[in-house]
């Protein structure tokens, strides 16, 4: 239907209605007129009525014709129609390419073919409604032709292709037909779609709205493919995407939706991917992340979208710090100083900075960061956060439990990694102001112990119901229950008990006596602490040894050493033999100092037994 024809239609309204005096005059003339003239008046009136009827019929015909055209447009999409559409697309693409080669300096010669090509690309969007037919795009080489058009000289054409690919790879559409989606994604990956998309990104001007939308849709394609096939993230990063994301993040441009999307895609690429983390470190990505986050050390994000970008950058930084080489880069880039400053400024970024410090210090790889943190007076920052959780945490989505979890984990890492004078400075903090920090530690201990007892009671009830129904509680179910216990507070409680064992073993009588006194006042037992540390030692590990997941890591040896303090001397021999059997002979080095055993076991023995075992040859164990 011609819409312009319908809009421009104006019915014949006839003559204007006469005024009252004109109407009287007209009636007098009709009375005075003869029969012939009266007949003429009737013929004129009939003519007007017939013209109105003709206009109505014409309008109805236009509407009927429009309905027929809509019925033709709503023909069902089938395999033959898709093949016909792909054939038309290939013809127009070839024709445009031929004319561009023939008349490179005369755009008028190929402009019409370019418009036709753009039209057929728009028509191909209908294929996204039928993912079962995606195999036709691959079999008829339409995917390769589309990828070739990503480098078209006219960015309008390349953007049209990006829009089409974004709709074809929509994650909801892909899940409608797993078979069709697999075929399409395989073809895109084989055609190095990410490399071609990055080349197209390099030439787009985001000051133009259409091209800015093209950038956004390009990132959407990557996100869709990464969600459907996570293993392609490594190839995507190596094909230039990671470098472009870092370049886009540090570009001096006002904050917009594309910068937010870049931070989100970056976090996706780094998730559970050590190769991408290493590549980011080699591209000086740690410095880029720190530079972008430094904006928020004294200023809060102005919008919710900007806050989301900040959280994405923090998540990316935490993910990178899982790699030991990136911790060195973080240390050299003065990341500790920036995080420490954020903790002092009390802005929204504080809770995320705490999480970054936790990732930077954990494990033996965090030793250098732990020592540097003490050197920059970080203890003055972390202990006020330990003594009292900050107010208004809920506004930034961080719970009190998450805050206490990160603080306790940082303190546990400091106690595990610090040596010499810096360790002494840390322990002295627990004796200040009449051991108030020990009191706070015991307060948290009983808080999470109560929470764990509630969770354990609920889990035991569920186990009882499962047994009654005849269900088998296998290892997978036990692991699920253990994860639930960790989430309920066991993870924090394990760190708290580890801190208790460390400070009680530090040969500081004031601390040992205070811990023992509070335990007696609350009617608690050291057996509970023993059980928690034992469970911690049995489950801890770095998870990087698929051949022997039960073997203890360097961190778990440290925990095992603490666990020995709680077992009693008569059981240390058996536990040591277990540790030595579980760990490579040339790496085992246990230093056991049961001096703290007097408080933890309840005995008053003052004798300090120091056992050092250096295993480089067959074991000789003498206690």
Please identify what each model-predicted range represents:
Residues 143-159:
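Blade-loop segments of beta-propeller domains
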Residues 148-149, 384, 433-442, 519-532:
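Eukaryote-specific, cytoplasm-facing alpha-helical/coiled-coil scaffolding segments in long proteins
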Residues 579-581, 593, 605, 622:
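Cysteine-centered motifs
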Residues 1-129, 133, 170, 184, ...:
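N-terminal "cap/leader" segments of large eukaryotic alpha-helical scaffolds
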Residues 597-598, 611:
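Short glycine-rich, low-complexity segments
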Residues 46-47, 53-57, 63-107, 155-247, ...:
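Alpha-helical repeat/alpha-solenoid scaffolds of the HEAT/ARM/MIF4G superfamily
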Residues 110-123, 154-177, 190, 196-227, ...:
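Alpha-helical solenoid repeats of the armadillo/HEAT superfamily
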